[in-house]
């Protein structure tokens, strides 16, 4: 029997079929935090706001952010350090006839030194076993600060109890909290 599993989801009015291997984060359903990030992004930039823009999805997983952004017309690069997730992302792109790059990478190591982006998105992992670890999010914020073009936009979604605000202020100066529900988009 195949290890592959699939599920469908409607995101911002469009249908997607996602594929995943066992052990992939949020397998079987789109994480509500990712949905909130996409809603905030569309409200902030408008329905055509990503078309033709270069987007980096840090910690892309199976593509909950990458696939919708690609369908909206963005040129998306999804980076992910978990190989099962990268394979899941590639299969999801094929199944939905979408184009994006899916790179197996520890943070941004697979990117060229000069790669810069108009928009960077992330729903960073923060659990290692049962512990809350912010090291990955710290690395993602550092990469976003280094890889964002002038005038670019960085979207990070997290649980409200995670205090990313001082880190964002240190790296970017000003930032806005766009949405707060069970998660917050910064």
Predicted feature residues:
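Conserved beta-strand signature within the Rossmann-like core of class I S-adenosyl-L-methionine
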Residues: 151-158
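Conserved SAM/SAH cofactor-binding pocket of Class I
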Residues: 32-122
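Short beta->alpha hinge that forms the Motif I/post-I loop of the SAM-binding pocket
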Residues: 80-85, 136, 159-160
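Conserved SAM-binding loop
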Residues: 78, 156, 177
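A short SAM/SAH-binding and catalytic strip from SAM-dependent methyltransferases
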Residues: 119-131
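A short glycine-rich, Lys/Arg-flanked "PGG" loop and its adjoining helix->strand segment in the class I
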Residues: 138-150
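SAM-dependent Rossmann-like transferase core, predominantly class I methyltransferases
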Residues: 1-50
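Class I S-adenosyl-L-methionine
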Residues: 1-5, 159-186
